[in-house]
UniProtKB/Swiss-Prot annotation:
Lineage: Bacteria, Pseudomonadati, Campylobacterota, Epsilonproteobacteria, Campylobacterales
Pfam family, one: ATP-synt
HAMAP family for this protein: ATP_synth_gamma_bact (MF_00815)
Single GO cellular component term: plasma membrane
Name under which the protein is recorded: ATP synthase gamma chain
Keyword tags: ATP synthesis, Cell inner membrane, Cell membrane, CF(1), Hydrogen ion transport, Ion transport, Membrane, Transport
Family, similarity comment: Belongs to the ATPase gamma chain family.
Main localisation: membrane
Function summary: Produces ATP from ADP in the presence of a proton gradient across the membrane. The gamma chain is believed to be important in regulating ATPase activity and the flow of protons through the CF(0) complex.
Topology in membrane: Peripheral membrane protein
Source organism of this protein record: Helicobacter pylori (strain ATCC 700392 / 26695) (Campylobacter pylori)
Amino acid sequence: MANLRDIRKKIGSVKNTQKITHAMKLVSTSKLRKAEEVARNSRAYALKLDAVFDDVLSKMKNQGIEDIQSKYFRELERLEIKKVDIIFITADKGLCGGFNTNTIKKVLACTNEYKEKDIKVRLRGIGKKGNEYFSFNGIEVLDKINNLSSMPNYERVQEFMKKVVEDYLSGKTDKVIIIHNGFKNMITQEIRVKTILPIGYKIIHQNPQPSETQETITSEPSGSEDEILDSLAEKYVEYSLYYALIDSLAAEHSARMQAMDTATNNAKDLVKTLTISYNKARQEAITTELVEINAGVEALK
């Protein structure tokens, strides 16, 4: 009977876990819907920002690329890269499948790829899970910030990017990229790598263009061309990180929803298996008792 008691306890424990994972799935589903809406609105703003870039650059096209002196802009094909800063985004929490692991693997792969080319790499981390991983493995992370990937905040992004931009403009780094796990759809996430500094002259054509129904933006630049581009570039790099955080958060909720759904289904299967084992053990116990009773009756005859 001790075996039956153990199985009953296991069934009860698994059912409790099943309730928890199901509740977490529902919470993640709700958060995902909200995150999707924020991502759509943010994407609309990003497209408008791209349109402003396109408009300003088109007005300057007759000047020639060599006339643009802004340090934010470079011809990427001709740029000699010796130092790279990688900004990675992971979640602050776990229980989201391979969401964090896939991002970390990509960061390590990019780091090794650059080092093979004798390019110095510095890491800047956003998200507790990624920061903990690199700290545990003795890998230096220049800047660490937690509780931002779970709660994107533009003011904190500006503060974080201020150091990044200062290092870039002062020549401490030649290139800045963002690596994060992005939202593709309800069941799919994809690793995204984006160069935010320097801004290539063809950067606008690398991004999806506004639809034909989207409002056309017209602008008349005031001030020097470089001042205009610098002002736009600052907003561009800040919003690139902010949008990556929003995109990452939507992907995180999607990954957690799937992970909890899988855990719930596995719990259901385990309950079925344990129930079968319980019924078999119970039947064996009943059979054993009947045999013992019959044996006792026969002994009394």
